[in-house]
Each structure stands twice: as C-alpha cells, then as structure tokens.
Design a protein with these regions (language model features):
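Acidic/histidine-rich alpha-helical segments that form the ligand environment
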Residues: 13-34, 82-135
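Soluble, non-transmembrane catalytic domains of enzymes that act on hydrophobic metabolites at membranes
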Residues: 39, 55, 60-63, 127-135
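Conserved alpha-helical segments that form or flank metal/cofactor-binding pockets of metalloenzymes
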Residues: 42-78, 143-151
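Short, contiguous alpha-helical
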Residues: 127-155
Length: 156
C-alpha cells in the first residue's frame, strides 16, 4: 500500500493504471474482431486466450485504480488506436497482422510493461500486479512468435 503522505505518488500510479487499462481494453476489443475474421483455427484458439488475458488485465488494472481512489478516464493513444484498427481489419491477412504486432516489440525480454512495473515500485500491490501481468504478456508474445513462424513456414 502507498504511504499516507504519498498523494502525488498515488496520483501518478492511478495515471499509469488508467492508461494501461485503456490500452488493454482496446487490445481485447481489437483481438475480438480479429478472431471473427481469422480463418486459421490454431490462431483463433490462441487469440481467444490473448483476448481473455487482455480483458482480465484491463479489469485488474481498473479495480486497482479504483481501490486507490481513481476513476477510469483514459483513452488509447492514436498510435494504439491505429494499430487496433489494422488488427481488427478483416481485409488484412493474419500473417501481416502478426508481423505488424511483432515488429513493434523489442527483441529482448525487457518490455514497456517492465518499465511500467518499475514506475509503480512505490506501490507494492500495483507493482506485483504489473509484474505478474508482464509474465502473461511474455507468454502471449512467445505464442504469437511461434504462430508467425508456423504461418511463414506454411506460406499461409
């Protein structure tokens, strides 16, 4: 829990959580639309898990920000909204969507979410929440890379 004299820190953590919940919610919605247009049953199955994780991450972040006295108000960035639009577009191939998503990620394990967790170190509960969510995100990225490689090998 945050120290009682940590109002500025609380506000900062609420802002981090708010931005994160908005991004995860937008991602879950876009992946849901991708699932509807996806023709590969393997990809569809994995995307269902990713969508469920993203929706749960959004709910967890929102619950934490509310516990800290905040209200969700953030919207996804323009860049994220544009990416979600491509992911949700039935006219874009699954391979292209995977390539676009994976191309935005660093090759190393350290991610923007790791940085977000570090930024929340002053709040032990939020920090632990974000560290655990980071593990989920890494699993999703590993699976997306595996699927991209499989689709590339198959030429589909």
């Amino acid at each position: 829990m945050l120290r009682q004299d940590a109002a500025p820190e609380r506000a900062r953590v609420i802002g981090l959580l708010d931005a994160f919940q908005a991004a995860e919610r937008a991602g879950a919605e876009a992946v849901g639309r991708w699932i509807a247009a996806c023709s590969d049953p393997r990809l569809r199955g994995g995307l269902r898990v990713i969508r469920a994780r993203d929706a749960r991450h959004a709910a967890l972040a929102e619950a934490r920000l509310r516990a800290l006295g905040g209200e969700p108000a953030a919207r996804p960035s323009r860049e994220l909204a544009a990416l979600c639009g491509v992911v949700a577009d039935p006219g874009v191939s699954d391979r292209s969507k995977l390539a676009l998503l994976l191309g935005r990620l660093p090759a190393r394990e350290d991610t923007a979410l790791d940085e977000l967790a570090r930024e929340a170190e002053g709040d032990a509960e939020t920090h632990a929440l974000l560290e655990t969510i980071t593990d989920d995100e890494r699993a999703s990225v590993r699976w997306l890379r595996h699927m991209h490689e499989a689709l590339e090998r198959e030429g589909t």
